[in-house]
Amino acid sequence: PYYHVVFTVPEELNSIIYSNQKLLYDALYHAASATLNELAKDAKYLGANIGYICILHTWGSAMNYHPHIHTIVLGGGLDDENKWKETGGKFFLPYGVISKVFRGKYLDELKSLWNDSKLKFHGTAEKYQNSYRFKELLDKCYEKNWVTYCKETFNGAQSVINYLGKYTHRIAISN
């Protein structure tokens, strides 16, 4: 089986992400990948190296700015001896754990970029140039529950190809 996992950041970060699209879209990919890899390798969840595909979306269903990562996760992986390890037919990572680990990894990368003075602040993000305001924003984001959507959606390679084609080869408003 294949699983569909969506990693979303709180809307409070949208203005900073919009001002730093390359850096913070990369951070989305890094945090999502690191979360999946770390948790899948943990023996209490799967104890294997998994395969997945990540797709960045920058808009939501209401045509609003809504950066998030869709992932297609293979239902199993290779253990340390390169033997296939099944997930047992259900998604193998707890949703709450995925959300908390992803939140930590994304905000850690955001803090590192801030500390290295790599972030730019335009428009409504200008207020976060102030270190106090930036820390307030981070605190607010750490306090929020980040929701990660997970479900089994795909049966077979053709379903995955159809899904990817639908979302990777269109714009926000299409026929």
Place the predicted regions along the sequence by residue:
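Beta->alpha loop/short-helix hinge microenvironment recognizer with preference
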Residues: P1-N175
